Amino acid sequence: MSYKMFGRCRTACFRSPNLFAANKGMPLQASVAGGASRYIIGTASVLVGAMAGFYIMNSRSAIHEYVSCPLVRLVTPDAEDGHKLGIWFLKYGLAPKLMFDKDDPVLKVEVFGKTMSNPIGCAAGLDKDGEAIDGIAQSGFGYVEIGTVTPLAQPGNPKPRFFRLPMDEAVINRYGFNSSGHKKVYDNVLSRVRQFLGAYFRDDTVNSLALYKDKLLGINLGKNKNGDEVEDYLRGVEKFQSLADVLVINVSSPNTPGLRDLQQEGRLTELLSMIVAKRNSLINEGNVLGASTHKPPVLVKIAPDLTEPELQSIAEAAKKSSIDGIIVSNTTIQRPDSLYTVDEELKNQAGGLSGKPVKPFALKALRTIHQYTKDTNLVLVGCGGISSGQDAIEFAKAGAHFVQLYTAYAYRGPGLIARIKDEVTEELRNEGKTWMEIIGQDAK
């Protein structure tokens, strides 16, 4: 292009009425001011959007307890639909997360030869098929338990089978071990392990199957409705030994006919002994992270509706079979007079009651079990009605090495976990103790 032609083009450009002004005749200064205003407004909008996004995705935000969770209950009159919606959000990373999750050292738990950064666990029943492990772990739990998983896929009991008692912050369920079965759940859990191992950036200090530093993954095993009461559990151990930090044997659901009969001392001792033998036979097969040996602890989950002699028998079965721990407890078939729910039909629905009203039963059973196991290495896990830091501390002082919850998480939202940890930390600091130092304190 010649110099003269370039000059003509340049002159034409600067004479263009629309190049620096939105309207004909607009002064250059006004155009610049308008552009600056638009830039400031745009930047502010982005910042406000980012702050709003951070607030919404931060589990500590009050909006989740007071708006999001009530809204979910409002749009899902059938509680099971609400359960499914919650899992969907957790599965696809849309649920709020505990930002900058760093646990106070006083919360550390040394258990099964491993470390948990905090003693708050998610109980089985929330993520039955291992679809949302990451979403749950990112709420701040130190332990995540999936299941119950049965060998074959089964639909469970007819619907409706899940009922809310909001005045009591409780639910009644009679799911009946609805499960996608061993193969599907195995594939779900293995898939995230493969993604972890294939990631370019990953934390090489992680040595737990939860795939998070100082967190553990438990897999809860059950039997099919018409399955063999021993073989079904052995198949579960064989299938999931390499994928679990902890294996849990569920013999206490009230919704599978005859299942609770397995809590009788003779039958339970035989069952647990065979499970431990199966676990031991697989130790040298290692785990999916490449460990040459792997020996996940075996825990049994029991009901809260047991007499002291029955609890003593379970303690004896646990000792004789050499399992590693007991989870106290599952749901209750009792309907205490303390329930605020006035709808007789609702509160007397068949199934297991969980949530706040279960706490007295679970705590009493835990204290009894601790009395008969305190001179052993058995690890006790408290579960039932825990919804605050004070609840967690009560269970610890009664003998629980760590605790689990589920129903309160559904009612209060993911921010509950941070709040419980904050409350426990504050109380421990006030007492000048650590979590490990208060375990069984009231029974000493």
UniProtKB/Swiss-Prot annotation:
Q: What class of enzyme is it?
A: oxidoreductase
Q: How does it sit in the membrane?
A: Single-pass membrane protein
Keyword 4Fe-4S among UniProt keywords:
no
What is the name of the protein in this document? Dihydroorotate dehydrogenase (quinone), mitochondrial
Summarize where substrate binds, as residue positions: K128, N173, R174, Y175, G176, F177, N250, V251, S252, S253, P254, N255, N330, T331
* Coiled-coil segments on the chain, per record: none
Q: Name one GO molecular function term.
A: dihydroorotate dehydrogenase activity
| Location, primary (coarse class) | mitochondrion
- Quote the cofactor binding remark: Binds 1 FMN per subunit.
Q: Which InterPro entries match?
A: Aldolase_TIM (IPR013785), DHO_dehydrogenase (IPR050074), Dihydroorotate_DH_2 (IPR005719), Dihydroorotate_DH_cat (IPR005720), Dihydroorotate_DH_CS (IPR001295)
Q: Which organism is it from?
A: Eremothecium gossypii (strain ATCC 10895 / CBS 109.51 / FGSC 9923 / NRRL Y-1056) (Yeast)
The transmembrane segments are 34-56
Q: Can you say where in the cell this protein is located?
A: Mitochondrion inner membrane
Catalytic residues, per the record, are S253
Q: What does this protein do?
A: Catalyzes the conversion of dihydroorotate to orotate with quinone as electron acceptor.
Catalyzed reaction equations: (S)-dihydroorotate + a quinone = orotate + a quinol
Q: Which GO terms describe its cellular component?
A: mitochondrial inner membrane
Family membership: Belongs to the dihydroorotate dehydrogenase family. Type 2 subfamily.
This protein's pathway reads: Pyrimidine metabolism; UMP biosynthesis via de novo pathway; orotate from (S)-dihydroorotate (quinone route): step 1/1
Q: Which GO terms describe its biological process?
A: 'de novo' pyrimidine nucleobase biosynthetic process; 'de novo' UMP biosynthetic process; pyrimidine ribonucleotide biosynthetic process
Q: Which Pfam families match?
A: DHO_dh (PF01180)
- Look up the domain of life of the source: Eukaryota
Q: Where does FMN bind?
A: A124, G125, L126, D127, K128, T148, N220, N250, K301, S329, G355, G385, Y406, T407
